[in-house]
Amino acid sequence: MNIKMMLLCLASTSCWAQKDSVNSLSVDLNFLSHGEVCGGGLPKPDDKDDYTEDRSSFLFGRTRLIVDYGRKGLQAHAVIQNSAIWGMKGNQALNLYEGWVKMTAKNGLFAQLGRVALSYDDERIIGTNDFATAALSHDILRVGYEGHGHQAHAILAYNQNGESVYSNTYYVNGAQYYKNMQTVWYHYDVPTIPLGASLLFMNIGQQSGDPADAYHHPSTKYQQMFGGYLNYHPKFLTLEASYYRQTGNQVDKYMGYIPIRAWMASAKATVKPSECYDVELGYDHLSGDDYIPVNYGGLNMVRHEVIRGFSPLYGSRTKFYGIMDFFYESAYSNGFTPGLQNAFAGANYKPFDKFTCSATYHYLAVTTKLHELDRTLGHSIEIQARYQFSKGISLSAGYTQMHGTETMARLKQDDSSKLAHWGWFSLVVSPSLFTTKW
């Protein structure tokens, strides 16, 4: 009888201890192996002759060590990241991709401090851009409230190139893209209908100047981004729309600053008749700079009195304007942005649980009126597929082909007579190493 009572007490104590566990710790790994083969579509470098081939292939690896700690009211998260091209000697990018602590109160208030991978709405303006080799993160303080369908966030950032008691300089070659940044984001989910709405305001300070020039002190210029995003998703249908404006001033090495007057709008509809497939249709319009003719084959850098070319800032561009990202990742040869019209249609198909595939067509054109040139840049077709082997192991692959026009050749200083193509694959392995609670 005494033995039975002791066993019962031990069992109940064990259950109580498991129920009362307040701390959790997990350690995970994430391996990404990525390969690309591409050709065509890029400007010819000035130091290359006309016979230089525009093609390349490479393999890339990224490893992440992910540590998570949590208890009631407190979270801590760290991601150490190494990324490099296979065969590269030295200069491998080993950094802290994320490292933050977050404190949460019972009433929904929270404060988060550290290096954070930010993602808002559809990631058009602020996203992780995880398809890129190193992805994006920001050193910030974020405070806010979340509850009852409301989300309100305020973000503050202040960056330095290094510790100094003599100056407060931060130039554009720093780890981040700005000297300081203030952002306010608000989102509301309507309880009676499947509608979500967001508002965003950003104030971004960029510093100009020459660190070696003691006579010209650094100057910080500010630009603003503000707008909204809507998502309406009744049964079988999702409607999305966004509109943003850019104002303020852009840092310029020679002129000090240039005023910004730019805007963008987008709309997208997705119909999902079944769990196996969906179709989508959409249009993006990004404003462009005034056109100034340039001579074919020369740089002829253009200086505008007003910047009218919209910049997606810190968004995940490959999600929207074609996965090759011809138009914002690689600059136009004469230094101006002619804007972009992107009309697209696509379909996603999931024949069984572990496999998905998609195909998308893009019609691409500039928004700026050009002299003696048509606005059409070209036509692009993208095919992608993904197979989930097991939990934490997946393989993705894709192929894109674009046929550029004479307009594309003139603005990018490339050869429009040949097809631009890009093939890629990504193998992701994410094992969970350790999980415990106490």
Regions found by a protein language model. Give the residues of each.
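Internal metal/ion-chelating core segments
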Residues: Q151-S242
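Beta-barrel outer-membrane channel/assembly domains of diderm bacteria
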Residues: A17-G114, L141-Y145, L230-S242, Q246, ...
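Outer membrane beta-barrel
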Residues: S56-E163, H187-P191, A269-G315
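Short Gly/Pro-enriched turn/cap motifs at secondary-structure boundaries
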Residues: R55-S56, F131-T133, G174-Q176, P218-S219, ...
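Flexible, solvent-exposed coil segments and beta strand-coil junctions
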Residues: L42-D46, I80, A117-I125, I155, ...
